[in-house]
């Protein structure tokens, strides 16, 4: 029987300056065993009994060194099928707003980063679910859609 798992989170980190929002994208190191060299948003696995929110906050700190100013639960759950485990992974999405003056400190998983437009960030993603999710963050969270006020997580 196929399992359904939820041990992975994805986080879109963005800043706002001068009325423009920018998204953080990072390139995975070429020697990473999983998806080497691709551009991605923050993607990480939960540890122990941590909640998805706790894992998302930890991953933001570990992968970027940034401290979120605000956080939202994005009204989107990504998914993929893992053939090796015969499992469907359900991935909750989060968005965090960071201080535009803060310095990014990459983990060893990544070799470069850039702050870019939402459209460009989506075009860099290898996976259609990530492209779709980035659009939802732009429309609902950054764009002030109805979900923004309903899904903000107090920090």
Each model region followed by its residue ranges:
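Conserved N-terminal beta-strand and adjoining loop/helix that marks the start
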Residues: 1-24
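Short helix-loop capping/hinge motifs at secondary-structure junctions, enriched
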Residues: 19-20, 101-104
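Conserved Nudix-box catalytic region and its N-terminal flanking loop in Nudix hydrolases
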Residues: 20-62
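Short aromatic/basic micro-patch
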Residues: 40, 88, 115
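Active-site segment of metal-dependent pyrophosphate-handling enzymes
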Residues: 61, 65-102
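Charged phosphate-binding loop/patch that engages nucleotide di/tri-phosphates or the phosphate backbone
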Residues: 126-155
